[in-house]
C-alpha cells in the first residue's frame, strides 16, 4: 500500500515536505519506506523508535524509489545484495547527522565498527556521544547500515529497531560483533 505522509518541521530541515510512503513486509517485520522525486527519504521498521508521524497518510499509486528500495531490501534479505544503490533524498537530519550517515555507508557488508572509530573516521574523535545520537536517528534502517556499529568491546548496543533485529542483521551478514570488527 502506498500513501502520502506529511513530515512536520520538527524532523525536517527548513520547510515541510510531502513524501510518498509504502509499507512492505520483510523477514524482520514490516517496514515503512518514504520517498520523494529525489530518492528514498527513509526506511523504518514500523515498530521502531523515531518513526515519523503516520497520521496524514493518503493512498497513491506507485513510486519508483519506493519500488526500487523494496526490491533491494528483499534481495538483501535473500542474500543476493550486499550494497544498496537506491538514491537517498536528504530531507532529514542536520549537516552533522548527514555526515555520520554518509560515513556509515563506507562500512562494508559483513564488517562492524565502534562508535569511537566512527567518530575518529569523521575527524571528531571526542564526539562519540554525538555520533551515537546521529547513528540512532538514522532514517534509512538497513540501507544506511547503522546496525554495523557496535560497542567498543564488540558488544551489541542500541538499535532503533531493537537489539534482536540488530543481531539478526549481523548474523545475516555473518558479522558477529568482535569477529570482523574494523575499528
Give short role names for the model-derived ranges:
Residues 5-126, 175-183:
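Basic nucleic-acid-binding alpha-helical/helix-turn surface characteristic of O6-alkylguanine DNA
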Residues 152-183:
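…primarily DNA-binding HTH/wHTH and HhH modules…
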Residues 139, 143:
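Major-groove DNA-recognition helix of helix-turn-helix-type DNA-binding domains
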Residues 71, 129, 167:
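Active-site phosphate/pyrophosphate- and oxyanion-stabilizing loops and adjacent acidic/basic residues
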Amino acid at each position: 500500500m502506498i500513501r502520502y505522509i506529511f513530515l512536520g518541521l520538527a524532523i525536517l530541515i527548513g520547510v515541510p515536505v510531502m513524501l510518498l510512503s509504502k509499507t512492505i513486509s520483510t523477514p524482520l517485520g514490516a517496514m515503512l519506506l518514504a520517498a520523494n522525486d529525489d530518492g528514498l527519504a527513509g526506511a523504518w521498521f514500523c515498530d521502531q523508535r523515531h518513526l515519523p508521524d503516520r497520521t496524514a497518510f493518503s493512498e497513491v499509486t506507485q513510486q519508483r524509489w519506493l519500488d526500487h528500495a523494496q526490491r533491494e531490501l528483499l534481495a538483501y534479505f535473500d542474500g543476493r545484495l550486499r550494497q544498496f544503490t537506491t538514491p537517498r533524498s536528504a530531507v532529514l537530519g542536520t549537516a552533522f547527522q548527514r555526515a555520520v550517515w554518509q560515513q556509515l555507508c563506507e562500512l562494508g557488508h559483513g564488517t562492524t565498527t565502534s562508535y569511537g572509530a566512527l567518530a575518529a573516521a569523521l575527524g571528531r574523535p571526542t564526539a562519540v556521544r554525538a555520533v551515537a545520537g546521529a547513528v540512532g536517528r538514522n532514517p534509512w534502517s538497513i540501507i544506511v547500515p547503522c546496525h554495523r556499529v557496535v560497542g567498543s568491546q564488540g558488544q551489541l548496543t542500541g538499535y532503533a529497531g531493537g537489539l534482536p533485529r540488530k543481531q539478526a542483521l549481523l548474523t545475516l551478514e555473518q558479522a558477529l560483533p568482535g569477529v570482523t570488527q574494523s575499528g
